[in-house]
Amino acid sequence: MKLVAIVGTNAKQSYNRSLLQFMQRHFATKADIEILEITDVPMFNETDDQTDTPVIQKFNQAISEADGVIISTPEHNHTIPSSLNSLIEWLSFNIHPLDGKPTMIVGASYDVQGSSRAQLHLRQILDAPGVNATVMPGSEFLLGRAHRAFDENGDLIDERTVDFLDSCFYRFLRFVSVANQLNLPEEIRFEPGTYHVTTEGHNGKLPMDVTVSEDRIEKIEIDSSGESSGIADVVFTRIPAEIIEGQTLNVDAVSGASVTSNGVLDGVARAVKQAGANPDVLRKRSKAPSALDKEDKTYQADVVIVGGGGAGLAAAAAVLQAGKKPIVVEKFPAIGGNTVRAGGPMNAPDPAWQGTFEAHPGEANTLQELIAIDESTIDPEYLEDFRALKVEVEQYLQDPSYLFDSTLLYRIQTYIGGKRKDLQGHEIHGQYDLVSVLTERALESVRWLEDIGVEFVRSEVTMPVGALWRRGHKPVQPMGYAFISVLQKYVLENGGKILTDSPVKELLVEEGTVKGVRAEGRNGQTILVHADAVVLASGGFGANTKMLQKYNTYWTEIADDIATSNTPAVTGDGILLGQSVGADLVGMGFSQMMPVSDPVTGALFSGLQVPPANFIMVNTEGKRFVDEYGSRDKLSQAAIDNGGLFYLIADDRIKATAYNTSQEKIDAQVKAGTLYRADTIEELAVQIGMDPQVLADTIKKYNSYVDAGFDPEFNKGSFDLKCEVAPFYATPRKPAVHHTMGGLKIDTSTHVLNEKGQIIPGLYAAGEVAGGLHAGNRLGGNSLTDIFTFGRIAGQTAVKENC
């Protein structure tokens, strides 16, 4: 019999560990007992899903394969330790390996009564819905005065105690045999037909049609139009496929899309119930065979790319265009990374196009203030460009009626926008050669994407939050998905390969040259990819709060519970991989917050996200508090200084400029109470708890500034629309971690450099995993330009130098 024994504490010295080790030896002829430690289990946080991390999956797999479970708990403040509680939370959040699993509770404590109260509480927890373990009644083993209970060999001293433990354990063996009979597969019968159900997805309702025959689920059709394109797409293919393949509801949620995953599973369960069957029967069946694949695999490629976001797919496309074979290895079930979550357009100066648009009020003032900067504050390598820009701007200001732009303006704004001081007063700015490549080749990247198949809107030029200038190229399709869908199609149709569910654990090095990767598959199997070169494109570490806190030198505090707009996949893996072969790091102390994030989830796709020229930010008192056209870090700090929570106020015309939304989504959010709407500004103020007169006065003043083209309060850099056409809207916002500027040190060819400034042979990096470009603050819209410019360069250089 196979049993798993869990040490219910992360303490280095524990009598509960000693008890389980004794049981492992003492009952070795009766059962194979595997002891699992909870030392590395993260504290439970439902906004930071760790279900698919190796430590949680180790418990999931071991418990699923075991005949029974033993949990040994100490007693802390009359209950179980928080670390044990966190483990159980993780094992009942998106996975449920304890459901129906025969479980024995034991415990050891200094107290004479052992861990009796903790064991009672643990029993209640294990009986709870979602956990639903089958706990052995009675016969609980409580080891009191544990500090006197063991001899020098770790054996229990008292024979009567051993005898009682024997009786409890032998009863548990019988209990396991009987209880597991309840878990044997049952036959199921449906009333044939197609059943329509509506369940909850991440963004709202998910209508579904489930077709069943007499004994099978035959088809699952989901209307996913309400979900964000690209983010949850894998849910709508994988989960129905595994349900049908295994005729089971024992299907794991997809990492990064747990809400939608559980929505699909709940919807099918409802349909099963409508068809006259018990969904619990399907929940207790084993997983689909494809979900249990453990076969090791080995691949050969010319270039292997770590990360399936924009930078990784751009690198793969460049490798294919050079006539070579790439393999992309992606950590998560779905590709796209942070790119698919991008909420804004892509920066690139295109003066011929931009010049066909009229200038906005305030833009000429922005340029005048820029060229008035004291030259003594400009770093030497940028001074020649700054002086040349002054000449360009002075010529433009003779007729400032149209929208101006140039490569020099883009370069200087990227430089100044990233120039920051840390908490100790140390200054950082973007590496000149990297900034030059970005700004010179940005439009080339737009044209390259167009050639591959991305369509851009030509009827408007826009600007994401904190971009400082209108030079945004907005795709026709939803923002990030527009890039990922086209690049994925290009890579697959031209002979590239993409491996998902495969976090890379190690770089393979041969005689000092990086020659491939070792990854771990969905079920722990080894995946080897041998290649002539490796490109790291795995993103930053915005979803790794501990790593943010470790390196932070810019923000006064990064709270433990801070939200992020990032995919949960970006936890710094590529940076650690680079360090493992000697890579140097740069700018790690600087991270960026997105000021206009959802206050609960950190996401960017809720509410009305409009161009900054139409931002009207008010604090909880109904007053403006910042130049809304400013950089992201300044907007975020201003929001934090005003309590964190603020509101974006909009009217019906401003609503029409919003990204990534529809009237249907807006109506659903108003109904859900996450977006506010009213026929008057005063009524809107009442809904969000403000003084109606204060908010009305704020909007009246703002409208007068738009008319005048000048903001005497905060000197807003650009205006577009007034707020005066009903209905009016308020979108609650709060800063969340959005981007990490630091990373692996690279050169303009994307070689990864070691601490001596030397090239690490065979290793390249592009995108957020690399540092040195954005310095202390990234301009909005520059991340997309970064990943597609340097992603292409990485693929091209890797082929040129190694293949």
Swiss-Prot record:
Database matches in InterPro entries = FAD-dep_OxRdtase_2_FAD-bd, FAD-oxidoreductase_2, FAD/NAD-bd_sf, Flavocytochrome_c, Flavoprotein-like_sf, FMN-bd, FMN_Rdtase-like_dom, Succ_DH/fumarate_Rdtase_cat_sf
Keyword Oxidoreductase set for record: yes
Top-level EC class? oxidoreductase
GO terms (molecular function) for this protein are: FMN binding; steroid dehydrogenase activity, acting on the CH-CH group of donors
What UniProt keywords apply to this chain's record, in alphabetical order?
FAD, Flavoprotein, FMN, Oxidoreductase, Phosphoprotein
Q: Where does FAD bind?
A: 311, 330, 338-339, 343-344, 573, 739, 768, 784
Q: Which cysteines are joined by disulfide bonds?
A: none
Which catalytic residues are annotated?
A: 632 (proton donor)
Q: How is the cofactor bound?
A: Binds 1 FAD per subunit. Binds 2 FMN per subunit, one is bound covalently and the other non-covalently.
Q: Which SMART domains match?
A: FMN_bind
State the EC number(s): 1.3.99.33
One cellular component term from this protein's GO annotations in UniProt: membrane
What the entry lists under Pfam families is as follows:
FAD_binding_2, FMN_bind, FMN_red
Phosphoprotein as a keyword of this entry, yes or no, is yes
Instruction: Identify its protein family.
Output: Belongs to the FAD-dependent oxidoreductase 2 family. FRD/SDH subfamily.
What does it catalyze?
A: dihydrourocanate + A = urocanate + AH2
Which gene name does the record give? urdA
Q: Which cofactor does it need?
A: FAD; FMN
Misc. comment: S.parasanguinis strain ATCC 15912 is significantly more abundant in subjects with type 2 diabetes (T2D) compared with subjects with normal glucose tolerance (NGT).
- Protein name (database record): Urocanate reductase
Chain positions found as FMN phosphoryl serine: 258
What is the documented function of this protein?
Catalyzes the two-electron reduction of urocanate to dihydrourocanate (also named imidazole propionate or deamino-histidine). Dihydrourocanate is present at higher concentrations in subjects with type 2 diabetes, and directly impairs glucose tolerance and insulin signaling at the level of insulin receptor substrate (IRS) through activation of p38 gamma (MAPK12)-p62-mTORC1. Therefore, the UrdA enzyme from the gut bacteria S.parasanguinis strain ATCC 15912 may contribute to the pathogenesis of type 2 diabetes by producing the microbial metabolite dihydrourocanate.
